[in-house]
A protein has these predicted regions:
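Short alpha-helix
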Residues: 184-199
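A short SAM/SAH-binding and catalytic strip from SAM-dependent methyltransferases
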Residues: 106-120, 143
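Class I SAM-dependent methyltransferase SAM/SAH-binding core
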Residues: 35-97
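Class I SAM-dependent methyltransferase Rossmann-like catalytic core
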Residues: 2-18
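C-terminal helical/coil "lid" or tail adjacent to the Rossmann-like core of SAM-dependent
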Residues: 3, 204-258
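Conserved class I S-adenosyl-L-methionine
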Residues: 138-169
Length: 272
């Protein structure tokens, strides 16, 4: 099966995903920054977007940080045509950014991962320490209170109903709801604002980016471990993924749709 390692890589290759991240980088306005950190950079898709927009000087540094050595090696290969010695690859987790990145940065970009942080206050506080006064923290997420577009309620309800029925019928399994952890709770935009303010950051720009997601996007997100575990906690990964994918196919066919809208929350905050 494509995405059998259950990583985010398969989903991240979707064209619409690159486009929505490009809009976040544009919103952050990094062109005059000297030091930019791409947090949880994975294979370098967002790092490339930053490199394409930044005005390079001798002192320009784009830091690509990820916990996975394999992802960083792939990023090095993927960015070879554009990096031109401006990229610094750093292996480390998002939990200790200020220790790993010793010199403060102008901007931190953190795409589609903030919702997975178990202790958001701790991590955002540490990110804030790594940013220069007046510097920016830009992030986006589709997993927030408001991510489900109002026109897609029927799609989600039908998809989940079908996926759970397939799981029960084909595998005699059901999710273990007690295993759904607090970090999976989706914050509202207001709660994100409070989170930022508690950690010395103030919202500068905020917008909702509505994206038309094709069937491939939903099939691919159904191969990503964090999404699978959040949707079907306690179910073996392969069976949960198969049920979600078959549910998607049946739902798209039944509704006769080609795309389903999904909202992404884009926020750029400034360190005060």
């Amino acid at each position: 099966m494509a995405g059998e390692d259950y990583s985010f890589t398969v989903f991240s290759k979707n064209a619409f995903y690159a486009e929505l991240n490009a809009r976040l980088v544009d919103l952050a306005d990094v062109k005059s920054d000297l030091r930019v950190l791409d947090l949880a950079c994975a294979t370098g898709g967002v790092t490339r977007l930053i490199l394409e927009r930044i005005n390079r000087t001798r002192d320009t540094v784009v830091i690509a940080l990820d916990h996975s050595q394999t992802a960083l090696k792939t990023a090095m290969e993927e960015l070879r045509d554009i990096s031109n010695n401006a990229v610094q690859y750093v292996q480390g987790g998002v939990e200790n950014v200020s220790e790993v990145v010793r010199d403060s940065v102008d901007t931190v970009v953190f795409c589609n991962a903030i919702h997975y942080l178990p202790d958001k206050d701790k991590v955002i506080g540490d990110i804030s320490k790594a940013i220069k006064p007046g510097g920016k923290f830009a992030f986006n997420t589709s997993f927030y209170e408001g991510g489900q577009h109002e026109d897609s309620a029927a799609f989600y309800n039908k998809w989940m109903f079908k996926a759970f029925r397939i799981l029960r019928k084909e595998y005699n399994l059901k999710p273990v709801r007690s295993e759904k952890v607090e970090s999976r709770r989706q914050l509202s935009p207001e709660e994100y604002g409070d989170l930022l303010e508690r950690n010395g950051l103030k919202i500068l720009k905020q917008k909702v980016d509505t994206v038309q997601v094709p069937i491939e996007g939903w099939l691919d997100i159904s191969t990503f471990s964090d999404f699978i575990e959040g949707t079907m906690p306690g179910v073996p990964m392969d069976k949960a993924s198969a049920a979600l994918q078959e549910g998607i196919k049946q739902t798209y066919a039944e509704l006769s749709v080609t795309h389903v809208p999904r909202n992404w929350l884009d926020i750029v905050a400034v360190k005060v």
